[in-house]
Amino acid sequence: MKFSEMTYTRPDIDALLARCKQLAAKAADAPDGDALIQVYYEQSRAFADYATASQLANIHYTCDTRDAYWKAEQDFFDANGPAVTNASVEISRAFLANPYVDALTEHFGTTCVAGMKNAVLGMDDRTVELQQEFNALVSQYQQIYGGALVELDGKQLTIPQLGPYKEDLDPAVRRAAYEAEAGYFDAHRDELDALYTKIVKNLNQQAKVLGYKDYSELSYVRMNRIGYGQAEIQAFRDQVARDVVPELQKVMAMRAKRTGITHPTFTDLPIIFKDGNPKPIPGYQARMDAARTMYHELSPETAEFIDFMQDNELFDVESRPGKMSGGYMTSLPSYKAPFIFANWNNTSGDVDVLTHECGHAFEGYLAERDPNVPADLECPAMESAEIHSMAMEFLTAPWHHLLFGKDTEKYALLHAEDSFVFLAYGCAVDEFQHIMYQNPDLTPDQRNAEWLKLEKKYRPWIDFDNLPFYGRGAGWQRQLHIYECPFYYIDYCLSTMAALQFFLLSLDDHKDAWERYLKLVRRAGLASYTELLQTAGLKVPFEEGSVKGIAQQMTRWLEEHQVG
């Protein structure tokens, strides 16, 4: 069914909550392990219509944040979502209280029961009002960001549409683009500062209600991190600061030499090549045709997947006024249909987001069609889900010539370099959030000072050159995740460590790398992060020394593939 034909009906929340009570009673009373497993499948199906309606509303709202109807529907889910989540938690509580609960682990693997324990520990009726308030705060942030229109080049442009200007070979044009963006954020400075203060206060209050010290502690439960905690994440960040940052300084020196920009400032960083960055082929249909060819040749599974996505018009990827920034993949369970949202702006990032979100969507497509995988275990925790997307970016490389033509080698260098360099920024975002939630009384200026310290620690090559907004340390405010889904961002770093390993493997044997990837993807949400890495024969980045070897191999590859 085409996306435009999918019908939306606002769900009956009271009926759903009553159904949840029945399911909780069934879970509590299941007389043996087999019965408990069947109830688990049943409860997992029970949320399909609600989840589909919720995601349809969110898709339509993010496609046009100015549409009053979809804004009202989004508000409805913001207000009612916490009650549904908590009803789901009560079902989990009933499963955990059943004496046959171990049957779920035996049948589904390690993540099922551990995930329910995290759900129970992370949610409570006492936090419903606070959750509703948090949802409303996020919607306010999305409206500020999604409503951004700035004046440049005689045009009114959205933030994503500034992308090509930020990559212009004329430094004055780049500076003007960054200043236009900075002007918008500076104009909303007080609102953004106040919103973040409220978000930190709200989430820390939720944590205290649930018996945690602060939200940095609760976030590990809410993010469903299984088998590791703050100590392991800090050990990983320490390895990045110690073993990756020195390698990245070599990489940035290579970039400066390549571009001929002797003393690059922040607005020079998007320039990767002297004669301009790689540009994908123009035209929506041309790109979609190239993607279809690429996925048809990659594997039979991806061929079936891309036909389904394109034939059912499950992409909205072109930027326009009122559309929310960023990109995402979501799922419409009643239709077994993934959906991909993006904001193309005629930069190489258009291909990044296409292959990235297709990685998520491909995993969702397979999991939704596996009868052994319950709906709520179709997707693993986010640090694992991002492996699907980030590895896909690399594993499609043999077909990138279809999307880049003569710029293919430049894109290969740019993509590998950007993915490697990203580790430093991702760790800075994560450490920043730990500091914010552990020190909630910091003033806005103190928050910005902490951000600038982390920039020096993780990205010592950056010179902001008195750029408004960024120069005062407020650049973190344009990172959607910091407001919308705190502590998510490190997941990109953990998955990057897996994706870089898939990249290095694919250089030796692409077929072997793809088969390992497919094996990992097919485990859906039935395995933890470390188990998934072991499934594919990859190194676990928490282990001392695991990061250094990968970093050195990446630097060597980049040294050998300098072009432009």
What is each residue range found by the language model?
Residues I261-A290, E363, F420-F422, C427:
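Long, K/E/R/D-enriched contiguous segments that form extended
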Residues A342-E368, S389-M390, F394, F432, ...:
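Active-site recognition of the HExxH zinc-binding catalytic motif
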Residues K274-S334, T347-S348:
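Auxiliary, metal-adjacent structural segments of Zn-dependent hydrolase domains
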Residues M1-P278:
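A well-structured
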Residues G122-M123, E179-H188, Y228-Q234, L269-P280, ...:
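Glycine- and acidic
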